Amino acid sequence: MAGNNHLRKQQMIYLKTPEEIELMGRACDLTSRTLAEMAKWVAPGVTTNKLDSVAKEFILDNGGRPACLGYGGFPGAVCMEVNEIVVHGFPSSYTLREGDIIGLDVVVELDGYNGDMCYTFPVGQVDEKVMQLMRTTKESLYKGIDVCREGNRIGDIANAVQTYCERRGYSVVREMCGHGIGRKMHEDPEVPNYGRRGTGPVIRNGLCIAIEPMINLGSRNIVIEADGWTCRTRDRKPSAHYEHTVAVLDGQTRILTTFDYVAQVLGDRFI
């Protein structure tokens, strides 16, 4: 679940112990399996309410808590990001249609720790220009992860994402960002998707963050709807969103969430 980018000067960063990172890994595994459970249902004719109920039931059946549900009054277990919705869309009676795309952003709390991830799915056959947006956004996630190394800075992650996407003609949402994660869904530091190399907090051993590029086909400008949550592109062109929770431990970067379960469900439809 993306945070709001406030560009605060002072941030309180909580570094995790190896034992805490192990607990986060378990939460992230359940988060990953929840996303795959929803993937089984992504198809024309399915409502976003149905996807939300699938996730909620799966999380509860496996001993977790859907952390988005009730967070600041958010009404669902999962953020539903259909087409031009960038982040924080509500589950509803909306029925998926051929050619839609949908980002499913899910946060699971297990044993006091959170895992956070997002994957944008094609619904049936999708326009190739939109598919390329999705591929580029996912690739930019891994460009950011590649530079999430001890001794680097948060700005290195931001710049890697921004450079990769903008060089390919896409725009980067600036008002929303990734974030630290642990016992709380949203912790410091903020992790923007734009910025300069060599700036921002230093990446240290024990850092756990959610990296989540939100990339638009058209303009970077966004609008917050009257519900106070739903964020969409101003020009109503599609937006894509991919996210992993990562940890820095013993000088190595570990991706705690995984798309492998989703890949098993989607087969040759996996992006």
What is the predicted role of each segment?
Residues 2-271:
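Active-site neighborhoods and metal-handling regions in enzymes and metal-associated proteins
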